[in-house]
Design a protein with these regions (language model features):
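The feature captures the conserved acid-bearing segment of alpha/beta-hydrolase catalytic domains
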Residues: 175, 181-241
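The conserved beta1-alpha1 loop
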Residues: 63-65, 219
Length: 288
């Protein structure tokens, strides 16, 4: 696939990090939808890196979630600023993309999985996964990136997409990190009772059959989107079919609104960072 890139803005050298560079690229993507329809449009991809590196750096593709309240326009490429900084400080080039339908990327809601009682998670994650794969291809083409040393990570819907990417065995990816990944949650109207968790459990089992890279799953004990027990069942289904992974039960998150522990990625970084450090070290990414 050709990758014509349009540089929207070459950001700045931060005073606190003299060599920190941020830029926003547009990436033309093409996704196959239901009935073999094709949708083509540009994605906004934020690229965050340390320009002082003396050799190509590993990369991390970071995926965002999906709003329970339908506020798709609120997403930003730098929405996880503190978490992006952590990964850049670990030596990664971070690519944080906005999928079709979200934030500045705009467009239709191509990931819609249907009604709550019959959610088609396989379709929805396949559409998101096609976009992840094309962002990965972009990453591996950039001159300052080591194309064989990549990680895919995400939060909420993006966490599930990280496991979907692991199941694709995409070139250059050697690990996946799932922060509170899942789908169909509504912490206000159905706290701890997401739509059709059984269907998502079966899908995670399917992912486990083909995924070959190590994975890390992190969930807070008071995640109001999924509850405490359902994520354990999802992880068990994945590993029972051959998926490699480690599950970390993070502590409860307080004063975080209706979602509770679903905000662990942004609210208790000190709790999860030690586990992510260990995982990255184990798969060959030592601290610079």
């Amino acid at each position: 696939m050709a990758l014509p890139l349009i540089l929207l803005c070459f950001a700045f050298l931060s005073p606190a990090h003299a060599a920190r560079v941020e830029e926003i690229l547009t990436l033309p993507v093409s996704v196959t939808l239901r009935h073999n329809e094709t949708h083509n449009q540009n994605l906004h991809v934020g690229v965050f890196r340390d320009d002082s590196a003396q050799k190509p750096q590993p990369f991390l593709v970071l995926g965002h979630g999906r709003p329970a309240n339908g506020n798709f326009g609120a997403f930003r490429v730098d929405g996880f600023r503190k978490q992006i900084d952590y990964f850049v400080n670990r030596g990664f080039v971070v690519l944080a993309h906005l999928r079709i339908g979200y934030g500045a990327s705009g467009g239709p809601d191509v990931e819609n999985a249907g009604p709550c009682n019959n959610r088609d998670f396989a379709y929805s994650y396949n559409v998101g996964g096609q976009q992840t794969a094309q962002v990965l291809t972009l990453a591996r083409s950039l001159p300052y990136i080591d194309p064989e040393r990549g990680v895919v990570a995400g939060q909420s819907y993006g966490g599930a997409l990280a496991i979907e990417a692991a199941a694709r065995n995409l070139p250059g990816i050697i690990g996946a990190i799932n922060f509170a990944g899942g789908g169909g949650g509504d912490p206000v109207n159905r706290p701890g009772q997401p739509c059709r968790p059984d269907k998502l459990e079966a899908l995670y089992a399917d992912y486990g059959r083909t995924a070959s890279v190590p994975t890390l799953w992190l969930y807070s004990e008071n995640d109001a989107f999924w509850g405490k027990d359902i994520p354990h069942a999802w992880f068990a289904a994945f590993t029972a079919q051959g998926g490699k992974g480690r599950f970390v039960q993070l502590p409860a998150v307080h004063n975080a609104g209706a979602g509770g522990g679903h905000a662990a990625f942004t609210r208790i970084q000190s709790e999860w960072q030690v586990h992510v450090d260990r995982f990255l070290n184990d798969i060959g990414f030592t601290t610079p």
